[in-house]
Amino acid sequence: MRALVTGAGKRLGREMALYLARRGYDVAVHYAASRKEAEAVVKEITALGRKAVALRGDLLIESQVEKLVPMAVQGLGGPLTVLINNASIFEHDTVATATRKSWDRHMESNLRAPFVLTQAFAAQVPAPRLDDHGEPVASGMVLNMIDQRVLKLTPEFMSYTLAKMGLWALTRTAAQGLAPNVRVNAIGPGPTLQGARQSDESFVTQRGATVLQRGANPADITAALGFFLDSAAVTGQMICVDGGQHLGWKTPDVLDFD
C-alpha cells in the first residue's frame, strides 16, 4: 500500500503521514519549503519499517504539480492507493480586499492542485478487486482536507473559503465520476493546532466556543482518516472534526431572545 500526502512535513500532514506508515503504508512526503521537516518525517517513517520519500513541489506551479504522482510512484516502487490533498494556503481577505493575486494563490493551491493530483492519481489506480459477494472494492481513495467553514459560511477569508467550497464540490463530483475504482472523501477540521499568528488566548477561546466546548486533536483527525480507509462503502462524504464548530448557533438574535 502506498500513499502521497501533500504538505506532509508539518502539522496535520505530518500526523497523517505517520499514521499511514503505522497502518502499513509506504508514504511519499510532499513539501514546498519545509525540506528539513519533510526529511525528518521520512526518517520517522523508515524507522517504522516502511518506505518513504520526500518530494518537493510548488502547488502554485502546475508543471511541478503534474510531476508529483509519477515521482511518488517511482520513488515508492508501485502505484499509489491513497492520495491526501492536505497542503493549503490560508490567507485573509474579504470581498472588499481580495485581489487577483489572493484569488489565484488560493484557487491554484487549494483547488486546482488537488484536481490535477486527483486526475493523475485516478489514472494509475489499479482496477477494483471483487469481494466475497462479487461486488467491486475501490482500489484507491482520495482524502481532501477541507474546512468546517464550508458548512458555516462567513464573509472572512473570502478566497480561501471559495476555494474550499470548490474542493467540497470536487469531492462529491469526483466520487461520482471515479467510482467504482476510487472513493473520494473529506475531513473538515475545526480548531486543532494553533496557528502561527494566533495567540494562546485566541486559540483557547476558539476551541472553547465550539458546541462541545473543545476543539479537535491530531488523533481525532487520524481517527477520521482511519474510518475512511476502513469503510469500503463510503464515498463523497465529509466528516467535520471540529467540536461541532459548524453547528454553532449562539448568535445575537438567539442570545437576546427572552
Could you say what each language-model-derived stretch is?
Residues R23-A40:
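Conserved glycine-rich Rossmann-like NAD(P)H-binding loop of the short-chain dehydrogenase/reductase
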Residues L20, P79, W168, L178-T192, ...:
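Conserved Rossmann-fold SDR core element
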Residues N217-V241, H246-L247:
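C-terminal substrate-recognition "lid" of short-chain dehydrogenase/reductases
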Residues T94-V95, T99-M107, Q206:
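Substrate-binding pocket helix/loop in short-chain dehydrogenase/reductase
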Residues R129-A179, P191-T192, Q245:
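Catalytic loop of short-chain dehydrogenase/reductase
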Residues M1-A28:
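Canonical Rossmann dinucleotide-binding motif of NAD(H)/NADP(H)-dependent dehydrogenases/reductases
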Residues N86-E91, G244:
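Conserved NAD(P)H cofactor-binding loop of Rossmann-fold oxidoreductase domains
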